[in-house]
Amino acid sequence: MINNSENVQNNSTVSPQPITQNILIDRFNPTYWRIDGPQTMSFAITNYGNGFEASFRSRMTTDLAGISWDSYDSKDHKFLAYETKYSYSGVVWDFDIELSPSMPVLNNESLTPTLTVYYNDNGVDKIAYIVLFNYANTPSSRSAHIHINWDTVKAGFSATDSFPVTNIQQITFSAFTSSYNPHSSLPLSQAEDGYIRITNSVVTGANAKLNLSRVVVPQHNYGLCTSYDDHYDLNPQRIVDNMAALGYHGFINHYCGMSHYPEIIWRSDINRFQIPDTLVTGQDVINPCTRKWHEKYAQALHNANMQPVFGVSFEMYSLGANEFWAQRDWNSNLGKTGYQPPSYFFSLSDQNALAYLHKVFIEFADTMVTGGCDVNMQIGEPWWWYNTDTNLPCVYNYPTKLAFNADTGLYAPDLGTIYEAMNKTGTPYDEFKTWLRNKLGQTCQDIRTAIKAKYANAQVCPLIFFPSIRSPIQTLATYINYPSEHYSYPHFDYIMTEAYDWLLEAKLDLAHQAVSQIPTQDLGYPASKVAYLSGFVPDASIAYIYGFDKNKPYRTPIWQRIFGDMQNNVSLGLMKQFIWAYPQVMFDSITIDTTQAPNGFFVENTLYTPISDNTPYPPDIYL
């Protein structure tokens, strides 16, 4: 048994440490603002001139987004974060603001735009509202120069309320349209778009500057994964700057998410939001804020000599789901994930659902081109789902049963659970299982064809999850989710692979065996056309799913195996190994320094050695 302390290279005077330097930035630097709001809204914060633009789409009368500066940087790696300064005393802030025509004018009496200040006063959290028109040179307009002296600024409509500025946690601009009504939550007759632009920010006086930490490392060969659902609130430039500083270059794997990109439209006939039926209406399926964010992300990646791979899954977020398009089990129960709220899965036999999915891929490909990047798309992970609480496969929605009958003349049989299905043989069981497998493979090939029809030079790959196709017990899921003939080279330009379950079970031999054999020997890909995602470290909220105690130091032992896993695969000559994922690298302050520590990695200041075998996890980190 190896415990953590045996794998730590002690922080002594001779032990290497990350090399860092500090640079000075202005407080309220435009790259470090965030945006967030309710799930019914869409929003994005991106570069605009010498400042930022916060764009948003409101769909409810109560929709309001917050554009925030945090005094404490909780989003960045320890050696990439800006200095924490809660005191705003001595700070004078000048900036230009521009509100969209859909927003109220600055001195609107009932909906006056404000800067909300969250502060602490003698241990009590309080809120003050700075009414912006009181500090504007043109208070009756939507464009103005704002001058705020934090030593004298006052809150309230008439600027009469003093408040302390020595312990401010956060300041927030509010983004809303003139239809905003906090007392009546109703869907708008149609979505309303808006923006707030902050430019020409100048900060003077004491406390005007902040130290920004910058780790100094050479470039290395590992890639990194990002995800829109994790980073929708950040300026994409911030993410790219951080990755470049940490030595990442070349390919970056980006999951386009499933909960924030969809355009959703209020359907009064069913009294809920729903994604559009683009086969019927021709409407865009990605909301304009997501489109802008990804265009700016692609542009920033391109400028930093990085090439994104944009991945789209088969998941459908429940908030706007069209449940007629979803996979279902024999009892018509929806296939759904265990998250709250859950996501569902697009049926592979519903033509309207597939048209929607094709358009998602095409619209994300469009953003790559707008940003100056080559089109490179990852399909999936593609699969037929099964519900883990019942082990029932979700292969029975009506279009699937109809398509099977049309193709074979047979009726879809009850396969039972994913385990029972393997003991049911003969007609129509064998035909149904084979048909399901081929349907998945053909669906992926059809997506590839749709992308290449518009972008002939596009690179397209499927993502396969090794534990789902190689398990000790063969199940229906392992069979139908591995259409090897359809996935084989050269049907796709390359293949993306992953095996995180085995790393979390300390079965690194299985992961290495799979990545070294399945893509090349089974599917015929050259090693140089095999990419691999290594990870991940579960967040505290889901650590229990994998048996870890969130209150114990479980994270570093997992990192040791992630790096050991990748170390095992170096000799294979793979196209790229990606670390899954950016939020965990930021949270744990993971640094790769091939000069200071060619055989290890840093967690903050501490150097660790990888574990590349099946050494069990320390027993004290389990529940």
Whereabouts are the PLM-identified features?
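The substrate-binding groove and active-site-proximal loops of carbohydrate-active enzymes
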Residues: 224-230, 273-288, 341-356, 429-440, ...
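Catalytic domains of carbohydrate-active enzymes, especially glycoside hydrolases
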Residues: 221, 227-278, 282-285, 296, ...
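Extracellular beta-strand ligand-recognition surfaces/modules
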Residues: 95, 146-195
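Exposed low-complexity, polar/acidic, P/S/T/G-rich flexible segments that act as propeptides
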Residues: 178-213, 594-600, 604-606
